[in-house]
Swiss-Prot record:
Bias kind Acidic residues: ranges: 526-536
Region feature Disordered, mapped onto this chain: 69-108, 517-536
PANTHER family assigned: MIP22305P (PTHR14095:SF0), PHOSPHATASE 2A REGULATORY SUBUNIT-RELATED (PTHR14095)
Domain EF-hand: 174-209, 261-296, 387-422
Protein name: Serine/threonine protein phosphatase 2A regulatory subunit B''beta
Length: 536
């Protein structure tokens, strides 16, 4: 036998397919054991082996198999007879004289002698799943390796954290204040060094190299076994920012205010980014927000007050001072009566009650009837930036008394009644609720005029005015009189938010008050711009 291996299903004998002139298929089928011996004898012939081997090679190669012919045709000799000449056994006789037993056999093709399955050639499927992402292209990897070798040259023991800052900025293209967080991600054993091989394993082999900036930052900030970012994850980041940013150097002598600044930045980040409000920033929330751009801006801009999103020191100063003004006993907690004094008694009792009922947001102070600093940060951002989505959601929950997802006429009237009463007490011209209701409906343009949904509010640029009408008398009167100062501010700086404009006005006011106080105490020095940057 030749080396050709015939699969089992191809070596099974089908007598009808043999198409032998010497013997009928009836005889072959009636004696399977005898027939199998004949088949084995035929398969042992050299010519049969060559024929079968050729067919198998064609089948494996995917080539068309052409063995057509008939037993009586010229190609019948291509497959040899099972028996030597003159040695064929006699045929079994038919029933005598019965014409019905006589059967003329029609010629048939020899091509189906063996059932050869023409299977397609299997092509290898390229890898499509990579646990750490698709590897970087060789060109990008080579460029990165060249830069890595340059920065680690001469540092056989690795780089220390101060030396690692250049790697963070120049190779990783991340803000420099990420250096400590990135360093700790690689130096898992706290050796104080990051070697070349360890950095390559984390940044290149871990495919951090080709990830987008948002993914890189998310992986660096979050804990290894978590799929989200919590407040504590920002601590090393902000600690390094305070230690290295030129616009925050003046705070290094007052560590207590460094801590307050870091807390305020973190609260602002979670207020705008963590839309679920569960204290856990997901990758999707991080990607949808503007935090990454703000971080890159903070790293490039020496004047931290120009980084209006999250990091402005002036914004922190305003928030902290406003809280300090209300916290008369300075226990870092404020109650309802304290909050009623906010904005020169601008808020109604009814809205303050709703705030302290914690329907908009659960307080973190853990003290009954008291609002902590974090709670106040959420409140002031919601109150002074009513054009933002977090603010609309905050106040919608307060006005929606039955929490059924819509604000009805009765709910709006409930809050406006106190506004109306206050206007009458101040001898102001009162605006009837029916008139103001039509005005609010015109501003919002709800899908159903019988009620207002959160979706309706998010679709209107005037939604903040509706809330001012309902519970902030000072802003309501300013809106009614169309304060020319506010209108001019909006036209001069159309890109600024309501919060940006408020914080700027308040910072100037607070700075001037402090300057006057210093002068009255006889401690005023020659005033310059630097005093605005170092109020503490």
């Amino acid at each position: 036998m030749v080396d050709t291996v015939i699969p089992g299903d191809m070596a099974c004998l089908d007598a009808d397919l043999l198409q032998l002139q010497e013997m009928s298929s009836f005889v072959l089928n009636s004696k399977p054991g005898f027939t199998q011996k004949l088949f084995d004898q035929w398969l042992s012939l050299p010519e049969a082996q060559r024929q079968v081997g050729s067919l198998l090679k064609d089948a494996v190669a995917g080539a068309p198999i052409n063995v057509t012919g008939s037993a009586s045709g010229s190609n019948s000799a291509t497959i040899p007879s099972m028996f030597p000449a003159g040695s064929a056994p006699p045929l079994s006789p038919r029933s005598c004289g019965s014409p019905r037993t006589t059967k003329q056999r029609a010629p048939s093709n020899l091509g189906s002698t063996l059932k050869v399955v023409n299977e397609p050639v299997k092509e290898p499927i390229p890898q499509f799943y990579f646990q750490n992402g698709r590897p970087p292209p060789s060109e990008i990897k080579e460029q990165c390796m060249f830069r890595i070798n340059h920065f680690f040259y001469g540092h056989m023991d690795g780089l220390q954290i101060q030396e690692f800052k250049l790697v963070t900025r120049e190779i990783c293209k991340l803000p420099s204040f990420f250096s400590t967080s990135l360093f700790r991600k690689i130096d898992l054993n706290n050796t104080g060094f990051v070697t070349r091989d360890a950095f390559i394993d984390f940044w290149v082999n871990g495919n951090m190299l080709i990830m987008d900036t948002t993914t890189q930052i998310f992986k660096i900030l979050k804990q290894k076994d978590q799929s989200f970012i919590v407040k504590d994850d920002f601590k090393p980041l902000l600690k390094e920012l305070l230690a290295t940013h030129p616009g925050l150097e003046f705070l290094q002598s007052t560590p207590e205010f460094q801590e307050r600044y870091a807390e305020t930045v973190t609260y602002r980040i979670f207020y705008y980014i963590n839309r679920s409000g569960n204290g856990r920033i997901t990758f999707r929330e991080l990607k949808r927000g503007n935090l990454i751009d703000a971080m890159l801006h903070a790293d490039e801009e020496e004047d931290i007050n120009k980084v209006l999103r999250y990091f402005s020191y002036e914004h922190f100063y305003v928030i902290y001072c406003k809280f300090w003004e209300l916290d008369t006993d300075h226990d870092f907690l404020i109650d309802k009566e304290n909050l009623m004094r906010y904005g020169n008694h601008a808020l109604t009792y009814r809205i303050v009650d709703r705030i302290f009922s914690q329907v908009a947001r659960k307080f973190t102070s853990k003290v009954e009837g008291k609002m902590g600093y974090e709670d106040f940060v959420y409140f002031i951002l919601a109150e002074e930036d009513k054009s933002s989505v977090p603010s609309l959601e905050y106040w919608f929950k307060c006005i929606d008394l039955d929490a059924n997802g819509i604000i009805t006429r009765n709910e709006m009237q409930f809050f406006y009644e106190e506004q109306l009463h206050r206007m009458e007490c101040m001898a102001q011209e009162a605006v009837l609720f029916e008139d103001i209701l039509c005005q609010m409906i015109d501003m919002i343009g709800p899908e159903n005029e019988s009620h207002i949904t959160l979706h309706d509010l998010k679709g209107s640029k005037l939604s903040g005015n509706v809330f001012n009408i309902l519970f902030n008398l000072n802003k309501f009167m300013a809106f009614e009189t169309r304060d020319p100062f506010l209108i001019r501010q909006e036209r001069e700086n159309p890109t600024l938010t309501d919060w940006d404009r408020f914080a700027h006005r308040e910072y100037i006011r607070l700075s001037m008050e402090e300057d006057v106080e210093d002068a009255s105490n006889g401690s005023a020095e020659v005033w310059d711009d630097s005093s605005l940057e170092a109020p503490f």
